[in-house]
Design a protein with these regions (language model features):
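Active-site lining segments that contact anionic ligands and/or coordinate catalytic metals
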Residues: 251, 260, 272-275, 296-298, ...
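Alpha-helix capping and helix-loop boundary segments enriched in small/acidic/polar residues
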Residues: 156, 196-202, 218, 222, ...
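Beta-propeller folds
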Residues: 1-421, 425-433, 437-442, 493-498, ...
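Active-site-proximal cap/loop segments of hydrolase catalytic domains
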Residues: 493, 511, 554-758
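Active/binding-pocket-proximal capping segment
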Residues: 281-283, 321, 329-333, 344-345, ...
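Cap/lid segment of the alpha/beta-hydrolase catalytic domain
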Residues: 141-159, 171-177, 191-193, 438-444, ...
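Generic beta-strand/beta-sheet core signal
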Residues: 171, 185, 216, 230, ...
Length: 758
């Protein structure tokens, strides 16, 4: 335990630091509900302070010194990633209006290049085959590499085209703070128009005609609160605010339906949704509320035409926590809706699916069918409902099959209302992403692209399985696992593994638990917040861990959405500790069943998953050799007590309101990582953050590491000085960030000296 001598300066950097930075202490009192917390490191919140910058730079210098022996390994991992990824590649073209749009990446360039070619005719729905050479008639729509020249950071937050392809709206962020400047480009001349709109939120859109821009601005707490209408060719000072949301619990956004016939304004808190519509025939009309906004009711809206009548498809939780799907007339949306999927009696389903088994997540409407995205049995699924006429509007829901139960099927990019096929993406822990085209009329599937994995990779070398760990309260927690078959083997026959063939076709059904001959080095990932599902997915960069004998696992803990709405409800507000204990119980299960051991187990999580990392570090430090926390939300109570901070008020429905509720205050105080650091034998800890992160401020991990170091923990802090919540923006720098973190993890696991062939 160490302290400064009381001088007012933070530790200064040296060329080669020989000791960790020791942050000065400036006691700051935080008093709420009769409790006072003394925060010695709150002074680090002053982002513009030279002293704070000096401290962060000193931390970076110390981290560099402590990981200098891993530079060779970092370079090797970076080279492996670079070798295995097809640097010069192209996406599958999507039709929009009279063009096929797609993107290209080129070796040596950080960002993608958006291009297009004209369709051959109105019946041209077959995407052209794209190679490395430009196609006849190919033209560049937007080259992010040119736009990013001279910038240390570059991100697009809006990218919207007019239906005729003559105009492009794009929004640029060059600092990482997620505040975008909008521009309109004339795609006929290639020149930007005079229109420039600063300080917007992501997700601005151009109306189908290309005449109007709709965008959102934020308040002082970075909450999107207003929707504006801009007429292209006019000064932004003349823009009209068409919607203002004063309630600080709600974000506001806008966008157009796939049909192009409706513009929506959407307000959303963590528990409540509101929708307003404007007909594209009169975009200067007032927004009309679709359903009255009711606390606790969430819904999403899509527009379609059935039997010549405009209808809204609405997914909602008015009557069922896992959502229902109805359709209502646009002319009278509060009229009683028609059930699109009916219950387990069999009518309206294919005879096998029961609506009670589905967590409905989204609906996409097309001219002749709708596509339903939902969760069943813990995994992402997709179903089709064909549309008829007004007398028989809905065919039975047909779930689309795929080859592996442990994989995930998603709806891809499908911009055209009239298209007869839909794009689908399939992936699993051992299956690189496959893009399919599914023709609804006859059910045929066509593979359009397989994620390329270059180098000497043998996809058959990897296996995946699904385990179930028992939580302390008896709940079964799913755990997705992937590993190299030739480096690990099972005994006892109590579980089997799925061999990765790269096409998602061959399956050996995964079992319950498995025992390994000897404990393996294992990286356990978790998130568990916002009902976000951490579905199994393939990662090229992860191969650098697997090939060095590391097993990778995802703990699908409560607070996420994997098993339905109840899974989320049991891991939020005053049930939040279930997220932490679930992760700990998964770790114990993996140890007890022989998969790993405490000296070979590293935990990883980011953002709200970083809160999970901080909590388990305090609650069960003995289970882990290391913890990697990316942009970690580790000073949760302080942040949620400050309504002036970005995202705080809207977050009260996720974590509770400790500012006004003493019970919530005490509950959060009992787990918030920063103020629960204690004298303990902590595992090695790496915290990575970004100075310009608006979502989780850099100050949280900075304070946390200072406090950890105060009690003797081996903790490192790495701050990206020009980046936001997502880290570096260029793909090569992003790969270097991954290589840095993987090298640290391998070092903790004792695998840093293993050389592999890329």
């Amino acid at each position: 335990m160490s302290e400064t001598s009381g001088n007012d300066s933070a530790t200064s950097t040296t060329a080669t630091p020989t000791s960790a930075p020791v942050a000065k202490k400036v006691p700051f009192e935080r008093t709420h509900h009769g409790h006072t917390f003394i925060d010695d490191y709150e002074w680090m919140r002053e982002k513009e302070s030279p002293e704070v910058i000096a401290h962060l730079e000193a931390e970076n210098a110390w981290t560099s010194a402590q990981t200098a022996h891993l530079e060779g390994l970092q370079n090797s991992i970076f080279t492996e990633i670079k070798t295995r990824i097809k640097e010069t590649d192209m996406s599958v073209p999507n039709r929009r209006g009279n063009y096929w749009y797609f993107s290209r990446t080129k070796a040596g360039l950080d960002y993608g290049i958006s291009v297009r070619i004209p369709i051959s005719g109105p019946d041209d729905w077959t995407p052209p085959e794209v190679g490395e050479e430009p196609l006849p008639g190919e033209e560049v729509v937007f080259d992010s590499n040119i736009a990013a020249e001279g910038q240390e950071f570059f991100s697009l937050g809006s990218f919207s085209l007019s239906d005729d392809g003559s105009r492009l709206l794009y929004g640029v962020d060059t600092t990482g703070d997620e505040r975008y400047t909008l521009h309109v480009r004339d795609l006929i001349t290639g020149d930007d128009l005079a229109d420039t709109i600063d300080g917007t939120f992501a997700g601005a859109s151009l109306d189908p005609s290309g005449r109007y821009v709709f965008y959102t601005t934020v308040d002082d707490a970075w909450r999107p609160e207003k929707v504006w209408r801009h007429v292209v060719g006019t000064d932004s000072s003349d823009d009209v605010c068409i919607f203002h949301e004063p309630d600080e619990r709600f974000f506001v956004g806008s966008g157009f339906s796939r049909s192009g016939r409706m513009m929506f304004v959407v307000t959303g808190s963590k528990t409540t949704t509101g929708y307003w519509s404007i007909s594209a025939d009169d975009l200067e009309a007032e927004p009309q509320e679709i359903w009255p906004r009711v606390d606790g009711v969430e819904y999403n809206v899509e527009h379609a035409v059935i039997g010549g009548e405009d209808r809204f498809f609405i997914t909602h939780n008015r009557n069922r926590a896992d959502f229902d799907l109805v359709d209502v007339p646009v002319a009278d949306p509060t009229a009683p809706g028609r059930d699109v999927i009916v219950t387990e009696s069999g009518a309206g389903t294919d005879g096998e699916l029961r609506i009670d088994d589905l967590r409905i997540e989204d609906v996409d409407a097309f001219a002749d069918f709708i596509v339903l995205s939902y969760r069943r049995g813990g995994f992402a699924r997709v179903g089709i409902i064909r549309l008829g006429d007004s007398s028989s509007p809905f065919a039975p829901l047909q779930e689309l099959p795929f080859g592996r139960e442990t994989g995930s099927l998603y709806v891809g990019n499908n911009p055209e209302f009239e298209q007869a096929s839909i794009r689908l993406h399939f992936t699993s822990m051992s299956t690189p992403a496959v893009i399919y085209s599914h023709r609804v009329a006859d059910g045929t599937d066509t593979v359009l692209k397989r994620q390329p994995v270059l180098g000497s990779v043998d996809l058959n070398a990897y296996a995946e399985t699904l385990l179930w760990a028992k939580a302390a309260d008896g709940t079964d927690i799913p755990v997705s696992v992937v590993f190299r078959k030739d480096l690990h083997r099972f005994d006892g026959g109590t579980a089997s593994a799925t061999a990765g063939t790269g096409d998602g076709a061959d399956e050996m059904n995964g079992g319950a638990a498995s025992a390994k001959v000897e404990p393996a080095p294992l990286l356990l990932y978790g998130y568990g917040s916002y009902e976000a599902s951490m579905d199994p997915y393939f990662s090229v960069s992860r191969l650098s861990l697997l090939d060095r004998g590391v097993v990778f696992a995802i703990a699908h803990v409560r607070g996420g959405g994997e098993m339905g709405r109840h899974w989320y409800d049991q891991g939020k507000t005053t049930a939040k500790k279930n997220t932490f204990t679930d992760f700990i119980d998964v770790a114990r299960h993996l140890i007890d069943t022989g998969w790993t051991s405490p000296d070979r187990l590293v935990a990883s999580g980011g953002s709200a998953g970083g809160l999970l990392m901080g909590a388990i570090a305090n609650m069960a430090p003995e289970l882990f050799a290391g913890i990697s926390a990316e942009v970690p939300f580790v000073d949760a109570l302080t942040s949620i007590l400050m309504p002036e901070l970005p995202l705080t008020v809207i977050e009260w429905e996720e974590w509770g309101d400790p500012l006004h509720d003493p019970e919530v205050y005490e509950y959060m105080r009992s787990y918030s990582p920063y103020e629960n650091v204690t004298e303990a034998a902590y595992p090695q800890i790496l915290a990575v953050t970004s100075l310009n992160d608006t979502r989780v401020l850099y100050v949280e991990p900075a304070k946390w590491v200072a406090r950890l170091r105060e009690v003797g923990a081996n903790a490192l802090l790495k701050t990206e000085m020009v980046a936001g919540h997502g880290g570096a923006s260029g793909r090569y720098d992003a790969w270097k960030e991954i290589a840095f973190e993987y090298a640290w993890i391998l070092d903790v696991l004792g695998r840093s000296d293993i050389e592999i062939e890329a």
